[in-house]
Amino acid sequence: MPSFDVVSEANMIEVKNAVEQSNKEISTRFDFKGSDARVEQKERELTLYADDDFKLGQVKDVLIGKLAKRNVDVRFLDYGKIEKIGGDKVKQVATIKKGVSGDLAKKVVRIVKDSKIKVQASIQGDAVRVSGAKRDDLQSVIALLRKEVTDTPLDFNNFRD
């Protein structure tokens, strides 16, 4: 019975590359000369540092541009509050979301069941497994989910026949 998993996970290698490219661009840009603006990555957490709120916005724009160029959806980032740190500097922490949350998993299962397509959807940890008799049904479910779920980036993997 063909099946696939619906997951929501960023490619961490591409995120790391985007962070390195952002730091390289920030170090060479004229408007950041003499400032301590940078992006640091620790596991699934990005920390943006800058001299003031305006420069922090510029750092965020550079990071978003680099992530977009590397095909990493920026909806994976969940920004925290802007914090003041010593010496008139600011920082902001952005966590990278992983997995399909419980609410989103229930929404995906409900969309699949309401579609009347002959497939079954079940929640398995931080993924949703969709299985059906025909591969065409699974492809129509993928198209349906891409159209219906727009607030969170979804990936479809682990295809089995």
Curated annotation (Swiss-Prot):
An annotated Gene Ontology molecular function: nucleotide binding
Stored Pfam families: DUF520
Natural source organism: Burkholderia thailandensis (strain ATCC 700388 / DSM 13276 / CCUG 48851 / CIP 106301 / E264)
Family, per entry: Belongs to the YajQ family.
Annotated GO CC locations: cytosol
PANTHER family linked: UPF0234 PROTEIN YAJQ
Described function: Nucleotide-binding protein.
InterPro entries: DUF520, UPF0234-like_C, UPF0234_N, YajQ-like_sf
Domain of life where this protein originates: Bacteria
Name this protein carries in UniProt: Nucleotide-binding protein BTH_I0730
Key words of the record: Nucleotide-binding
